[in-house]
Design a protein with these regions (language model features):
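PLD/PLD-like phosphodiesterase catalytic module centered on the HKD motif
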Residues: 1-217
Length: 217
């Protein structure tokens, strides 16, 4: 497992309509990673479904983890799944994971909201919500970082972690690896950490479980 083996195939930029961003970028990076950090304006569990083949590989075979920071503008379905975790569905996911990765991919693709709850309940995914302290505007940062323990691939651009952003809309991202642009990659790693730890002036970041109803309005 090494992100550096992708250096010959990773492009400097990806654009929806021209490139198949999910199978050409997201999935290969997930498969070679131990962690995925993502800061976005918008997130929906549909993104897990789209990249299921890579997500499942990272969290099951690689025993990797994801950290997500997003604005509180989540779908009602995703909020409900996270707040009212269906223990039966979580157990179903656990049994499938023990049996077959391919079956698990199919399950994540078919039931992304339950997959979201399963990943959070199993510690595979941590979610924090970011918002301006002033109450004006929204958190709309877009940073992504894949890491394998030694190397990293970072990306920035217009894509949100949604079906629209990853497939349907006209969007683009710029990508760079630590082997060719270490300073730029490290900048993005630190920028994500600052957001995650709540060290960005004017922005709060709190764990999803501590979010009040008012934050989602």
């Amino acid at each position: 497992m090494s992100l550096e083996i992708l250096r010959a195939v990773l492009k400097r930029s990806y654009r929806t309509g021209r490139d198949l961003v999910v199978p050409e970028f997201y999935v290969p990076c997930f498969k070679e990673s131990l962690s995925y950090d993502r800061a976005v304006g918008y997130f929906t569990s549909a993104s897990l479904s789209l990249a299921a083949r890579g997500v499942v590989h990272m969290v099951i075979r690689n025993k990797g983890k994801m950290r997500l920071v997003a604005s509180p503008d989540l779908t009602d379905g995703d909020i409900a799944s996270l707040r009212n975790v269906d223990a039966n569905q979580v157990e179903i996911f656990k049994r499938i994971a023990e049996r077959s990765m391919q079956d698990l991919v199919s399950k994540v693709e078919a039931d992304c909201m339950s997959a979201l709850a399963w990943m959070v309940s199993e510690g595979m995914l941590e979610i924090r919500l970011a918002y301006p302290k002033s109450g004006r505007g929204i958190f709309h940062e877009k940073i992504g970082v894949f890491r394998d323990g030694k190397n990293a691939v970072a990306f920035t651009g217009s894509i949100n972690e949604t079906a629209g952003g990853m497939v349907n809309n006209h969007e683009s991202i710029d990508c760079y690896g630590s082997w060719s642009e270490p300073d730029r990659t490290n900048d993005k790693i630190q920028e994500f950490e600052d957001i995650w730890e709540g060290n960005v002036p004017g922005v709060d970041a709190i764990d999803f479980t501590k979010a009040s109803d008012e934050l989602f309005k």
